[in-house]
Amino acid sequence: MEQFECITVEEAYQKLHQGAAVLVDIRDPQSYAMGHAPQAFHLTNDTLGAFMREYDFDTAVMVMCYHGNSSKGAAQYLLQQGYDAVYSIDGGFEAWHRHFPADVANGA
């Protein structure tokens, strides 16, 4: 994959629950703590190294932000770091929360 792909929250939910991809949330710590997808890895500048050690480059990665805009830059960055398959989630956490209100966790 030379370019990241934009996917819907429904596609992301399906990939996540099939174990086909990992989910990273790039929002600020306060927003993440107030609500995030339960399986999301909170990806920040400080946690990037740990993420890259934990997940091989052949791991498919889905990037979630607030509304689906910032995730595009982060998805491109992960591709440049060597990840083979990267997806940006359209609508971000706002869409996730709207579609899957029961699938939201709180805390860091």
From Swiss-Prot:
Major place of residence: cytoplasm
Catalytic function, reaction form? thiosulfate + hydrogen cyanide = thiocyanate + sulfite + 2 H(+); thiosulfate + [thioredoxin]-dithiol = [thioredoxin]-disulfide + hydrogen sulfide + sulfite + 2 H(+)
Q: Where is the active site?
A: C65
Keywords associated with the record: Cytoplasm, Transferase
Q: What SMART domains does the database record attribute to this sequence? A: RHOD
Where does the protein end up?
Cytoplasm
> Does the entry feature the keyword Phosphoprotein, yes or no?
no
Q: Which GO terms describe its cellular component?
A: cytoplasm
State the PANTHER family in the record.
Answer: FAD-DEPENDENT OXIDOREDUCTASE, THIOSULFATE SULFURTRANSFERASE GLPE
Official protein name in the record: Thiosulfate sulfurtransferase GlpE
Species name? Salmonella arizonae (strain ATCC BAA-731 / CDC346-86 / RSK2980)
Name of the coding gene? glpE
